[in-house]
Regions:
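N-terminal low-complexity regulatory segments of large eukaryotic nuclear proteins
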Residues: 1-15, 22
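Acidic, glycine-rich two-metal-ion catalytic cores of nucleic acid-processing enzymes
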Residues: 17-32, 37-52, 56, 63, ...
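Extended non-globular interaction regions in eukaryotic gene-expression and organellar proteins
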Residues: 68, 75-78
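Charged, often flexible domain-edge or linker segments that flank or initiate folded functional domains
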Residues: 73, 87-89
Length: 225
């Protein structure tokens, strides 16, 4: 059974399946099997992820002609909703996305994405490294769901340094989590999405602004050279 997730945060449980929106994991249909990408509340379920079949390729290059107009339409609406939320200063990190947009849009968006997901599964061979990709995707999804505690006062004080000003402003306005791009570089190294915490390019001066969730941090540097 094809289905789509409605949010990628662990606490925002929601899927679209059997032509209905479901917000309780206990009510997930038994036959859900194929979706676009991983969300933390899918851990433990035997699910296949179509996005991993592309191995970083642009999904637009694999959308059949008869679905391109529909996909473009729902994406324009998605961008409009995100822009409105940004202008209204509504945090998508602190709120579940499905609580911020009309249910009619969620249904329309998921219907189109289900069709694209099905097309990917039926036209592209499963990658030989799929199981590895899946484990990495799950790990990155779980990392993404962990909010980073930031000493905002310290970061603000570092804005006085011209060399640190831009990154300080980025840290103060970004989503307080790390969203990695699994296929972000040709070399296979990870990169991060824009508007999320810049963990890979963080200036050393900002390290003490990251507060531990428990007692302390342990920094481990793996050098592949």
């Amino acid at each position: 059974m094809y289905f789509q997730t409605l949010d990628d945060k662990a606490e925002c449980v929601g899927i679209y399946a059997n032509e209905r929106l479901i917000f309780d994991a206990d009510n997930f249909p038994a036959g859900i099997k194929n979706t676009w990408s991983y969300s933390p509340y899918l851990r433990g379920l035997d699910v296949e992820y179509a996005s991993l079949y592309l191995e970083g390729q642009d999904v637009w290059d694999h959308i059949p002609e008869y679905l391109k107009d529909d996909w473009e339409d729902v994406n324009k609406r998605l961008v409009s909703f995100r822009r409105s939320l940004a202008l209204s200063k509504v945090s998508r990190t602190e709120n579940c996305f499905f609580d911020l947009v009309p249910e009619r849009f969620l249904v329309d968006y998921c219907e189109v994405k289900n069709k694209i997901t099905k097309h990917i599964f039926t036209t592209i061979n499963k990658p030989k490294r799929y199981d590895f990709y899946k484990h990495i995707s799950m790990m990155l999804g779980d990392i993404q769901s962990r909010e980073i505690s930031i000493d905002r006062r310290l970061v603000t004080s570092l804005k006085k340094n011209p060399k640190l000003k831009n990154q300080a402003e980025n840290i103060l306005t970004c989503d307080p989590c790390v969203r990695y791009k699994q296929f972000g570089t040709k070399t296979g190294r990870l990169s991060t999405h824009k508007n999320t915490f810049p963990i890979l390019t963080l200036n050393r001066s900002f390290r003490r602004a990251i507060l531990p969730t428990n007692d302390f941090f342990v920094e481990i540097d793996f050098n592949g050279a």
